[in-house]
């Protein structure tokens, strides 16, 4: 899958879109 290149803050993977995961810096990627 593809993670949309949108800067989104997160606390967990489910806060992110599609195939994105929550990275350590607190943003989806």
Swiss-Prot record:
Keywords of the record: Disulfide bond, Knottin, Protease inhibitor, Secreted, Serine protease inhibitor
Localization per Swiss-Prot or TrEMBL: Secreted
Gene Ontology CC annotation, any one: extracellular region
Record site: Reactive bond: 5-6
Disulfide bonds: 3-20, 10-22, 16-28
Pfam families assigned to the protein according to its UniProt record, in alphabetical order: Squash (PF00299)
GO molecular-function term, one example from the UniProt record: serine-type endopeptidase inhibitor activity
Protein family membership: Belongs to the protease inhibitor I7 (squash-type serine protease inhibitor) family.
Domain observations: The presence of a 'disulfide through disulfide knot' structurally defines this protein as a knottin.
Function: Inhibits trypsin.
Protein name (record): Trypsin inhibitor 1
Originating species: Momordica repens
């Amino acid at each position: 899958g593809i993670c949309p290149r949108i800067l989104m803050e997160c606390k967990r993977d489910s806060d992110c879109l599609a195939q994105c995961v929550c990275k350590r810096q607190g943003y989806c990627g």
